[in-house]
């Protein structure tokens, strides 16, 4: 079987299975997810041993420490994955709900029913937890899924899919619900993107080049999960102690993830007081790159270049800019943002409302860290990614975002 036939076969199996699985009961889907959670806990040592193969290989290729952190699985993270599957199992699914029903003058009853999308493909990079999250969310929402992870996590993903398949078959269902493309050749992705007859939606989750390639070349409808060039703006009426805690968390709690803050904007009226505190807080932890005005206050900083304002670092680097007004901060963010997550720190209600109304991003915060843009933190159990587009879904993609609707019409012999 050549590469083209291999990928096509995976997609066909998912499509064929989806017709039956889409009508599975909620009880059955919960049972599958409970078994997945149990199997993850029972196979921790196996998962870790396979993950270590990926980690060692990544170290040998010079992968950065922040990206290695994305790849790493340990006892604690596997437990968290298993708990996440349990949370997804307990979520209230909208599949099968009739959200509206109305009667026409001719007696027809017309309703709108929530149904699964069908077959979802997801292309992702070095985070093996996505394998479990994606499978769990698709199963809960009645979808079949085609997984294509990155080559750097191939051993981890193979192990996780094997465990997921064991759980599905233990529950009495076909393992074809979850398909995994083991071929790491990028040509497999090219073939996958052509299969619009079998796959209903494609979700790319990774770096800018992966997303750009998918959006430009996929024949399948795409839900775009964008990069996270996230901003924190500290207003002139901010509580500075609160601001310090939020900026610290947003930047260094986990810099390799898409909801980490990459840019810090500071109002000119508080810059001379606030910036030295930030510099002291981040000294030897974060490389700060400042605008011209910032360098006058903290000359030890590295000078920011134009490309810094649009760069998602995913590392211990942050660019800092002093702004004259909230209006300037909003304009700067809307110009350079990837439309992911932005935050304002202020005690002024009017300014906060202006920021909420005028920032054009998927998640906009007042006095909280951007790190909360996450399916679990939003109460979704997990997420397929963070959508930065506006059509179909925006923000964390949970189970209800993996559905569509169809009309059901009840008649009594009406003709037109």
Curated annotation (Swiss-Prot):
<comment type="similarity">
    <text>Belongs to the gamma-glutamyl phosphate reductase family.</text>
</comment>
<protein>
    <recommendedName>
        <fullName>Gamma-glutamyl phosphate reductase</fullName>
        <ecNumber>1.2.1.41</ecNumber>
    </recommendedName>
</protein>
<keyword id="KW-0560">Oxidoreductase</keyword>
<dbReference type="GO" id="GO:0050661">
    <property type="term" value="F:NADP binding"/>
</dbReference>
<dbReference type="InterPro" id="IPR000965">
    <property type="entry name" value="GPR_dom"/>
</dbReference>
<dbReference type="InterPro" id="IPR012134">
    <property type="entry name" value="Glu-5-SA_DH"/>
</dbReference>
<keyword id="KW-0028">Amino-acid biosynthesis</keyword>
<keyword id="KW-0641">Proline biosynthesis</keyword>
<dbReference type="InterPro" id="IPR016163">
    <property type="entry name" value="Ald_DH_C"/>
</dbReference>
<keyword id="KW-0963">Cytoplasm</keyword>
<dbReference type="GO" id="GO:0005737">
    <property type="term" value="C:cytoplasm"/>
</dbReference>
<keyword id="KW-0521">NADP</keyword>
<dbReference type="Pfam" id="PF00171">
    <property type="entry name" value="Aldedh"/>
</dbReference>
<dbReference type="InterPro" id="IPR016161">
    <property type="entry name" value="Ald_DH/histidinol_DH"/>
</dbReference>
<dbReference type="GO" id="GO:0055129">
    <property type="term" value="P:L-proline biosynthetic process"/>
</dbReference>
<comment type="function">
    <text>Catalyzes the NADPH-dependent reduction of L-glutamate 5-phosphate into L-glutamate 5-semialdehyde and phosphate. The product spontaneously undergoes cyclization to form 1-pyrroline-5-carboxylate.</text>
</comment>
<dbReference type="GO" id="GO:0004350">
    <property type="term" value="F:glutamate-5-semialdehyde dehydrogenase activity"/>
</dbReference>
<dbReference type="InterPro" id="IPR016162">
    <property type="entry name" value="Ald_DH_N"/>
</dbReference>
<dbReference type="InterPro" id="IPR020593">
    <property type="entry name" value="G-glutamylP_reductase_CS"/>
</dbReference>
<comment type="pathway">
    <text>Amino-acid biosynthesis; L-proline biosynthesis; L-glutamate 5-semialdehyde from L-glutamate: step 2/2.</text>
</comment>
<dbReference type="InterPro" id="IPR015590">
    <property type="entry name" value="Aldehyde_DH_dom"/>
</dbReference>
